[in-house]
Amino acid sequence: IGPALPNGLALSWESVPSRSYVEMTVAMMKELGFDITLEGNSVTMAPYTATTPRTIALERDWSALAFWCEVVALSTSASLFFPGLQPESLQGDRKVLDYFEPLGVGHTFTSDGLQLTKKRSLVYGKLVYNLEQCPDLAQALITTCFALRQPMEIFGLSTLPHKECDRLQALVELATELGITVQ
């Protein structure tokens, strides 16, 4: 609502989970012609000035891809294509490809999109992930590691209890049901 306010809006914060979403929002607002500035931990939006209407293309959702990466990781053979996903992305969840690669998920970009393929797992020991900037990947990544009995250490999950349900508690309950030790 910032640009709709008579004096615009200025916001500051000490820390922000998922900073990439703030950066993506600012970039999209700029592309639409809004006067918005992000500097450090503050954002300033000037009052809206009417401009020529613009149409922009929205990126595909990278967090939704995590569950398809899980399907590939848990399969013995798979090849899936996702039109429209490109390597350049403002979304923090773009890291999903890096996180699932050691679990046997290969990827190739084409001009039309993204190809996922089953590869040999590259894991030798415990995986360590920091999901502070992409917490929406936690469910798919953690349940994949559960299913593969892959030791892992994951941190940066402080926002999970504040989603539509307590995602962290749900994952702990699932681990308990599967006989997996969670610390």
What are these regions, as identified by a protein language model?
Residues I1-Q183:
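Short, structured segments at the rim of ligand-binding sites
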